[in-house]
Amino acid sequence: MAVAGQLCLLYLSAGLLARLGTAFNLDTREDNVIRKSGDPGSLFGFSLAMHWQLQPEDKRLLLVGAPRAEALPLQRANRTGGLYSCDITSRGPCTRIEFDNDADPMSESKEDQWMGVTVQSQGPGGKVVTCAHRYEKRQHVNTKQESRDIFGRCYVLSQNLRIEDDMDGGDWSFCDGRLRGHEKFGSCQQGVAATFTKDFHYIVFGAPGTYNWKGIVRVEQKNNTFFDMNIFEDGPYEVGGETDHDESLVPVPANSYLGFSLDSGKGIVSKDDITFVSGAPRANHSGAVVLLKRDMKSAHLLPEYIFDGEGLASSFGYDVAVVDLNADGWQDIVIGAPQYFDRDGEVGGAVYVYINQQGKWSNVKPIRLNGTKDSMFGISVKNIGDINQDGYPDIAVGAPYDDLGKVFIYHGSPTGIITKPTQVLEGTSPYFGYSIAGNMDLDRNSYPDLAVGSLSDSVTIFRSRPVINILKTITVTPNRIDLRQKSMCGSPSGICLKVKACFEYTAKPSGYNPPISILGILEAEKERRKSGLSSRVQFRNQGSEPKYTQELTLNRQKQRACMEETLWLQENIRDKLRPIPITASVEIQEPSSRRRVNSLPEVLPILNSNEAKTVQTDVHFLKEGCGDDNVCNSNLKLEYKFGTREGNQDKFSYLPIQKGIPELVLKDQKDIALEITVTNSPSDPRNPRKDGDDAHEAKLIATFPDTLTYSAYRELRAFPEKQLSCVANQNGSQADCELGNPFKRNSSVTFYLILSTTEVTFDTTDLDINLKLETTSNQDNLAPITAKAKVVIELLLSVSGVAKPSQVYFGGTVVGEQAMKSEDEVGSLIEYEFRVINLGKPLKNLGTATLNIQWPKEISNGKWLLYLMKVESKGLEQIVCEPHNEINYLKLKESHNSRKKRELPEKQIDDSRKFSLFPERKYQTLNCSVNVRCVNIRCPLRGLDSKASLVLRSRLWNSTFLEEYSKLNYLDILLRASIDVTAAAQNIKLPHAGTQVRVTVFPSKTVAQYSGVAWWIILLAVLAGILMLALLVFLLWKCGFFKRSRYDDSIPRYHAVRIRKEEREIKDEKHMDNLEKKQWITKWNENESYS
């Protein structure tokens, strides 16, 4: 009841017209759309079929299944479902077809049997089949042993929708009487699908509940004329066998629902043999479609080929259609998969189109048509016939959950299917498009019509409009404009043109000959006016707008009707380069009153959408500046040079030439320039009449690669006058430059095409610009020229480095490697910081820049030199340098304190140098190329944008310097770093980007005294000093230095002096014994301090 209530509410909003999404020849105008509705909750429209009754009268009907319709009086049930007949020429409701109006409650139940779940017509004058797949057979009613089996059954009706002969009636229930239970035939559900073969010979049933819902297909003879053809034994045929009942012969696993959808035809596998097509939408969890053939000997239906679905739970095979889309005589197969989904692509439902390759299906790759998300696109697929009469059948696809429901119309073509829908019908009643019927002309206009059902108890019939082709011709007199020939025709310029346009129509069928009212339209220079330019012509008495219209009547096919008018040329026109285009087009006029055909409003024809809407002719100007023979033989020549533009100024410089090809080194410039020079001079000065005439409509067409776009042009010089004009297309991929009309003899022009390089990428290696000169004058050697340039991308990367500190010291005692536990025990801290700057294009599309550091790990004898503790980065993603094991190789404990200075104060170092016993200074330079073993540390600079920095934290290995370099005054350690770019294109140019960092290492003073001078040297120096002092005293004594002077010699003579205060060095808070004596000072400055 909940479902019924819901459907009732849906019915209240149904009944409105479908809206047109994109239009072709299915008429969607309100008065031409036919609507039929059923009882609320009856599911009127669940199934549809078009039926052509020939006897006792010619009728074309729409049959509508309503599987939830109320029961007939004698069916002893509430809802049984039913079948309705709809006459589209009548405004009244559809009529219920009365059959199955009895019931035996002791042996059967028709409650919710869903009569009308499917309905099919055999064709003109043929039978009709409709089924109730939930029909129940009962046994032992009202007893404890009561059982029910859902066999399902079908009714066959004669063409007049009555039961008339032995083949008619409801005895089509082949599961009745067989083994029961769902493992066999107890849940047979015959009639979920049923159809007739197109040759009228067979009726085909699907029973998807058989054999634990494996499903089967059964084919039975349905043609009394077989006896007249001496065919006395033909079937029935069944998957698994009519008598064998061998479920192992079913070609799909359990729960596959084989027989859920059906179609058939010849020309699927063989041109002569019929093939049955059945869907199994749950086979292998995705669905399958099986091609079956008859086996005369065993009466089996055997599989010929199986199509497998590609999406999990996609219901591949929910509906199938056999149709020859390309009209090659081989039937193609269309398969719906309404629950196919693709989350990334927002796909909800799909239809697969398999184009037949002369009966060979193994290598056929299907064309997939996709629906929108959750639309159930493909729940119904139908062959709707050739609705536009172009010779290729068409299909319709339903998508009932796309908004309120949609039906997509796809046309066939010589190549198969046109994947873009030619028309989309949009419903205003919910679930529009659940069922579709077509391939029959209901309104007798020779074009098949379309019926669309919904789950909201409504059906909409769309009538097809006849498609006509209108042949259009234009003649203009005179066909060329001679500005020197003027006449008294009424035009201010004295030049007139007579324009005549004629029309005739053709259509299918050839007997379709109604008079058609059209509006003929003549227009001149339509595109020129759209671009905002004024027209050079106007029609007489039509004002300034060059447009003329006239109503015409085409009385029948291939009967011509014409219109004629005079066109005036405006005065003083400047544009004589371009011809004057004149177009003719038509519109079908709707008559004020429309006649009715078969009680239906007349459907107006529509123009073929595949035909050109307009026809055009161009009127050219007569050429001037030609030779005596009135033939212009021009001699256009072109030269080019590539250059670069300096900033935003109009200053250009030529590109360097490398191996004969200009080379563009692209850094940060945004534009390049192509200098073009065009001349028109005689090729042979001795015979100037040979060529070099005026080049009429001279034009240069420049076509640019995807990496370049047109920006502007600059005219440099021209002779004898400037008349250059360049216009680019919308995306800047082509520029048309008008050189002049005419580009006269001995003319020349030089100009720049400025091109933007914003689309040049690191993959761009060449620039090819196609240059083509055009003129309406005679010149045979105007071959296109390709301007070529090589592109080199120069990366503006630089690296700089600094060491902190740049001077360090070593000293103390030697500590073995095994004894070290933390980095503080290694030696002085040195931090190397490298800054990388990118001033050019981002590297995101190029690859990864890598900083290569030649790390001085150890000296030549294998002893440690610099111990690398840690690598950190700024402005980069998390960095991982290789080889990773070279970083903190010994796994020492990291110190987070500030670095511990091992060096002495600077002043002490200076004094130690002053008192050095050896004036010759010893030093050494350590670098990778001479005396140090280095490791290449590679650090990818991922995420590098404009700048980044890398910090390498290291320790000087103190013990190595104590053991190896304590005798030296100092050492220099050189560390080199450079950048390279991996995965770079061949045209990447990376200038040398490297740096060198120097660190100076000094020994402390104690180390220098202890290790630099032996004790015996000190002893000898002391003894030598004493000896020299004794010798000096002896010499002074010999010279009388120690004798007392006489009185007169001792008269004092005074000289004022000041003695500087003695400078005493303080060490360890004690006075040093050796005091340095200062020289006498005889002059001083008052600003100085003396004692």
UniProtKB/Swiss-Prot annotation:
Signal peptide: 1-23
Protein name as annotated: Integrin alpha-6
Disulfide-linked positions: C86-C94, C131-C154, C175-C188, C489-C496, C502-C562, C626-C632, C726-C737, C881-C928, C934-C939
Annotated binding of Ca(2+) 1, by residue: D324, N326, D328, D332
FG-GAP repeat placement: 30-95, 101-166, 176-229, 244-300, 301-363, 364-419, 420-479
Quaternary structure and interacting proteins, as annotated: Heterodimer of an alpha and a beta subunit. The alpha subunit is composed of a heavy and a light chain linked by a disulfide bond. Alpha-6 associates with either beta-1 (ITGB1) or beta-4 (ITGB4) to form ITGA6:ITGB1 and ITGA6:ITGB4, respectively. ITGA6:ITGB1 is found in a complex with CD9; interaction takes place in oocytes and is involved in sperm-egg fusion. ITGA6:ITGB4 is found in a ternary complex with NRG1 and ERBB3. ITGA6:ITGB4 is found in a ternary complex with IGF1 and IGF1R. ITGA6:ITGB4 interacts with IGF2. Interacts with ADAM9. Interacts with RAB21. Interacts with MDK.
GO molecular function: insulin-like growth factor I binding; integrin binding; metal ion binding; neuregulin binding
Primary site of residence: membrane
Function: Integrin alpha-6/beta-1 (ITGA6:ITGB1) is a receptor for laminin on platelets. Integrin alpha-6/beta-1 (ITGA6:ITGB1) is present in oocytes and is involved in sperm-egg fusion. Integrin alpha-6/beta-4 (ITGA6:ITGB4) is a receptor for laminin in epithelial cells and it plays a critical structural role in the hemidesmosome. ITGA6:ITGB4 binds to NRG1 (via EGF domain) and this binding is essential for NRG1-ERBB signaling. ITGA6:ITGB4 binds to IGF1 and this binding is essential for IGF1 signaling. ITGA6:ITGB4 binds to IGF2 and this binding is essential for IGF2 signaling.
Bilayer disposition of the protein: Single-pass type I membrane protein; Lipid-anchor
Top-rank taxon, per record: Eukaryota
Post-translational modification: Isoforms containing segment A, but not segment B, are the major targets for PMA-induced phosphorylation. Phosphorylation occurs on 'Ser-1064' of isoform alpha-6X1A. Phosphorylation is not required for the induction of integrin alpha-6A/beta-1 high affinity but may reduce the affinity for ligand. Undergoes PLAU-mediated cleavage at residues Arg-595-596-Arg in a time-dependent manner to produce processed integrin alpha-6 (alpha6p).
Membrane topology, Extracellular segments: 24-1011
UniProtKB keywords: Calcium, Cell adhesion, Cell membrane, Cleavage on pair of basic residues, Disulfide bond, Glycoprotein, Integrin, Lipoprotein, Membrane, Metal-binding, Palmitate, Phosphoprotein, Receptor, Repeat, Signal, Transmembrane, Transmembrane helix
Residues engaged in binding Ca(2+) 3: D441, D443, N445, Y447, D449
One Gene Ontology biological process: positive regulation of cell-cell adhesion
Database matches in Pfam families: FG-GAP (PF01839), Integrin_A_Ig_1 (PF08441), Integrin_A_Ig_2 (PF20805), Integrin_A_Ig_3 (PF20806)
Motif GFFKR motif, residue numbers: 1040-1044
SUPFAM superfamilies per record: Integrin alpha N-terminal domain, Integrin domains
Glycan attachment positions: N78, N223, N284, N370, N731, N746, N927, N958
Residues with lipid group (S-palmitoyl cysteine): C1039
Residues that coordinate or bind Ca(2+) 2: D386, N388, D390, Y392, D394
